[in-house]
Amino acid sequence: MFENNLWTMEPIGRPENTIQGDKYRFTLLTPCLIRMEYREDGKFEDRPTQIVWNRKFDPVEFRIEKKGEGFELFTDRMHVTYAGGPFTKNSLNLNAVGGQNAYGAVWYYGEKGDNLGGTARTLDEVDGECQLQEGMMSRSGCSQIDDSHSLVLDENGWTQVRTGDGVDIYVFAYGNDYKEALNDFYRLTGKTPMLPRYALGNWWSRYYAYTEDSYKALVTRFEKEKIPFSVGVLDMDWHLVEEVNPKYGSGWTGYTWNKKYYPDPERFMNWLHDHGMKISVNLHPAGGIRAFEEAYPAMAKELGDVDTEHEAPIDFDITSRKFLEAYFKCVLHPEENKGVDFWWIDWQQGNITKVPGLDPLWMLNHYHYLDNARDGKRPLTFSRYAGPGSHRYPVGFSGDSIVTWESLNFQPYFTSTASNIGYDWWSHDIGGHMLGYRDNELALRWVQLGVFSPINRLHSSKNEFMGKEPWQFPMEIGEVMKEFLRLRHQMLPYLYTMNYRAYKENTPLILPMYYTYPAEQVAYTVKNEYEYGTAFIVAPVTEKSVQGVGRARTHVWLPEGTYIDFFTGLVYSGDREMDMYRDLHSIPVLAKAGAIVPMTEEIFGQEAARNPETMTIRVYGGADGSFQLYEDDNESNAYLKDECVLTDMDLKWSTGRFVIHKAAGRLELIPQKRTWTVEFWGVKDTEATVEGEGTGVEASKKYDEALGCLAVSVPETAATSEIIITLGAPELRENDVKTQVFNLLNQAEIPYMEKVAIMEILDKKISNAAKLTQLTAMHPEEGIVGAVGEILTAIE
């Protein structure tokens, strides 16, 4: 049990990369990454640890100069000075040179530098911000991970306490080359595995005493309203709670289905599977297995030393391999055989066990993940963050946040900054979990954030007033929620490819802006803005709409380039900061010129778990671009053997030529034929011709003037065919400023004559700057000048 078939461990560093004395050992991993050890007994550790699994990197060129009891070590990216003896800030330092950091960076042992932050164990009871643990990225150019106190893994994959004391740290000296640092962190600690496809759809979760009938009715209502969900999460009321005899303690921990609510659990879960939903079930395991549990006799028999006559409880001893193997075999596996797909490990009881330094949360995450993969399926866990290396066990559960605007405002930054410690698949309680207050716009903006987050899981408490069903909100709010939940599933082809990219290229779905633009000071100040895969820059709305304007204000930085709004089709010039104003129907999602985004309309039920027959490809004009669509079986670990299908797409903007190349690879994994619609966004209307390899492809074209979208529909075509679409005269559209401003003013709750006066200013034959000056002089309602100015100056 607990075999690791997902990662390769090579924990022993190369001898030729090692500098060793009686009490010290330095191991070069890359020209920028070095392991530093010091032990008085001279016994150094070569086994994998809870954090570090691989130390066998490529050979590194270096030179060394002996200096008394120490030495100076040089690579082309760093200079280490060690005076000998125990590590102190006076005896050990490192100077990072080269790379993207023009002035170098000095690190002294024990100093933390200007760390950019990592993530936190949980957002439980957080209202707004919380303190983050450190990540690997630092504006000072150097950072460290301290592995001195983590446990090691023996040859059987079980944890062992290190013997003796010592220092075991890894220093990252990458300057501001954050992408390279993150890549080597994953090489050191293990890759982020791919998620199964269903995990990227919408999750429904609520702490609520559902019954089989009420849950089926809920799912049926979702289907009727055409609201797609791919995961159903059952909180703790699936098991006996209030029914537990007080002599056994509370019902917080439980493993026995409440037959009053779910008379036939297997029937219920089969029904959910038939309706395209996977099932995750909540566990609070700390209370152990008590005599009232159905699994108690089998567990007691397996362990063999339980006083069942006196109903002795079986303590939850995560430090015992015998207990843990029995726990999975006797308690969890029978429920998985009934239909549970993965477990929600809701551990809230701290980090203390019988073994010093052993965090039970890490143990739960590690062994749950390995066990979930035992039959060759792609595993999944759902649990809190347990320190560096936790990215190996997706998905992260961030805990019970408070329902406030302050909590929403913190989550974009919290999510993107977690990439600084490689933790790339956070799942938040979208809409907030508890307390707080009712605010319909807040609920909507949270859903919009969720759709452009790693995982989109709606969740709330038992409070009868806190339901997240879209029909619980006013129609204008609920309908937009539905649109966004559908959009999440429409984006699954793009998201699944980004899922593969995270695994293959060590690049998380969400990155802070300073990863791509490390030399830009402003990239460090737009904390709620992030890159969302290869195509988008996202700046979620986290403030209430400006009264009177009817739109919410969000501060956005656009790097150099051209951008096209995902929702409105407006074209923007980059290399500037600006305030953007969005009504309830959208948030700032800016596609980069040349971006290619595969989407689908096959989004309901079991459609979400398979590769679609009908594809919509969004192509954003203004620059060349390329995309490689990744597809596989969506649920096994065959991706580790590169069993997949790749479909290349590319745009040559100057000639208007867009090509969908032949699909290549395991073609039996995708439909034999596909129907394509290619949408060119941000373009003027023009002719479009279609060529299909040996198929005589015919196509239809239509143009949406309001969105600047030219759609070319190609009928059913073999997946092995090449499709070439050529635009007659490719050119970016000119924004229809007058119509956009009219639509803004038409909905604004301001005096009618003020609206007329603003439109008159727009009609004047004067510069945009002069128009804004005259508009400001009118002293209109707050936000009107900014909202009009955004449209007026979108293209500079």
Predicted features along the sequence, with ranges:
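A low-complexity, Ser/Thr/Gly/Pro-enriched, surface-exposed linker/loop concept
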Residues: N4, L29-G68
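Short, well-ordered beta-strand segments enriched in hydrophobic/aromatic residues
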Residues: F26, I34-M36, L73-V80, I537-P540, ...
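Solvent-exposed beta-strand/loop surfaces of large extracellular or lumenal domains
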Residues: R47-E61, I564-L584, A688-S713
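Glycine/proline-rich low-complexity spacer/linker segments in large multi-domain proteins
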Residues: I51, Y82-D114, E601-A609, P730-L772
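Catalytic and substrate-binding clefts that recognize carbohydrates or anionic sugar/phosphate headgroups
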Residues: R63-A199, R206-Y207, E212, V219-K224, ...
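Aromatic- and carboxylate-enriched substrate-binding clefts and catalytic-loop regions
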Residues: Y103, W107-Y109, P228-M481, T516-P518, ...
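A conserved hydrophobic secondary-structure block that centers on an alpha-helix together
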Residues: E125, L195, A199, S205-E242, ...
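Catalytic core of carbohydrate-active enzymes
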Residues: Y369, G389-G396, F410-F414, A418-H428, ...
